[in-house]
Amino acid sequence: MRSYEKSKAAFKEAQKLMPGGVNSPVRAFKSVDMDPIFMQRGKGSKIFDIDGNEYIDYVLSWGPLILGHTNDRVVESLKKVAENGTSFGASTEVENELAKLVIDRVPSVEIVRMVSSGTEATMSALRLARGYTGRNKILKFEGCYHGHGDSLLIKAGSGVATLGLPDSPGVPEGIAMNTITVPYNDLESVALAFREYGEDIAGVIVEPVAGNMGVVPPQEGFLQGLRDMTEQYGALLIFDEVMTGFRVDYNCAQGYFGVTPDLTCLGKVIGGGLPVGAYGGKADIMERIAPSGPIYQAGTLSGNPLAMTAGLETLQQLTPESYQEFVKKGDMLEEGISKAAAAHGIPHTFNRAGSMIGFFFTNEPVINYEAAKSSDLKLFAKYYKGMADAGVFLPPSQFEGLFLSTAHTMEDIENTIQAAEKVFQAISR
């Protein structure tokens, strides 16, 4: 059995210093009935805690580290940039370079604006949609998390799902009234909402692959149906690709599924592990943003050279072949864990999209938030503890997906399968 004594002591101190002892709720490990594990360093596919325990890491800082921890090229480039200055409050050439790369790879993006977080990206995209259309309402989907902006904390997923909060105190009723929420993968509900409110719907925001109720891909025709309805009613289609961007495919989820939105929100991978966000889209829409247009948005550290450099170095190392390797690794992981779970009578369902993996403790297909909630959370908590003790670091929430990196090896996958086999054997007794 591993020792977590230093982590326990650090958490005890942290609880006196920060709300709940953490700076983001899911890190509190509440849904797995554990104290948080405090990390110290990472290299490649491995992460090490302050007690000296080593783990194969499938959290990867919640997605950004698609090359693994402390990638040599990323680290060296950051050292060089930091020596010249971490931020200037002025434009730099590296902003142009990352913007050109994003525009080249993301089908919907003709112009892009950099910000400092995914939440900033989605909040700004909603303001732009409202300003561009002159309408008020936003349609979103149950269990889809788009950051902690007031308009979007209505039946959100992710940590909100883990805590069992359908929304958050502090969100004014007037704001909530302008957010319409319908089930994911349910076009009929979308059609009903448009028939009722269509003239005042500014935009539809959706994760093209839901990543905050576990991993839930779109059913065939769902994204195209959204594209058709938004065009019919004059609303904007907004893809929140903060998580899926450059994780599902070389050209993001929109490239993989062949559906082009009006606006796209990005984050995580495009910062290479540093705080970042971006939103972009059609030029005529994006030109409404200040200083080109009247819709205001700004940020002190937007486009800072550290985040831009880390993002640029990360994206430059990704190739179409990288995503073929993700499929091979994912196939091996799914086949091995499914076989082990079945052998011990463990209910399970896998959902996958590129380098994103959802593993649910239910035999039912998981196509929306209601189905995701059917997963056995007590069984997940037992599995989580067992895997941590076996040296596998997973997201401490059933409603978060696993992430693969280019640094993960087939040996890592095999060791993960062997660990799962032993844990399933133990928890099935």
Curated annotation (Swiss-Prot):
Modified residues (N6-(pyridoxal phosphate)lysine): 268
Keywords: Cytoplasm, Isomerase, Porphyrin biosynthesis, Pyridoxal phosphate
Molecular functions per Gene Ontology: glutamate-1-semialdehyde 2,1-aminomutase activity; pyridoxal phosphate binding; transaminase activity
Protein name stated in the entry: Glutamate-1-semialdehyde 2,1-aminomutase 2
PROSITE patterns assigned: AA_TRANSFER_CLASS_3
Location of this chain's protein in the cell: Cytoplasm
Broad class of the protein's primary localization: cytoplasm
Enzyme class: isomerase
Reaction(s) catalysed (UniProt annotation): (S)-4-amino-5-oxopentanoate = 5-aminolevulinate
Keyword Cytoplasm (UniProt): yes
